[in-house]
Amino acid sequence: MAKFMNVVRTTVKVDCHDEFLEHHSELSKYDGQLSQFLIQTGDYSYCFVAIWESESDLIKARPVMIEFLNAIRHMMQEISPELGVTDPVSGPVIFEQ
């Protein structure tokens, strides 16, 4: 079974930056999640990246991940009316070295 990854891009409101980082530092791994990363891509821009054992593990974790997102949603800037505050993508790992 192929590993699966998800990536979520977001921008944090300036006055919520420290609170956003604190919430992520307290985040535990979800069942089926092999690892997770928060990368800073700009002054207030971030991508959350996670590697999963399988797509089904990611799907099972979605309700809990949405709860986490709802708890921090007020800290993030809207990317666009179509996307809201996050730009998520996911897919199977095609190559790993």
What is the role of each PLM region?
Residues 1-70, 74-97:
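Short S/T/G/P-rich N-terminal loop/turn motif that feeds into the first structured element of a domain
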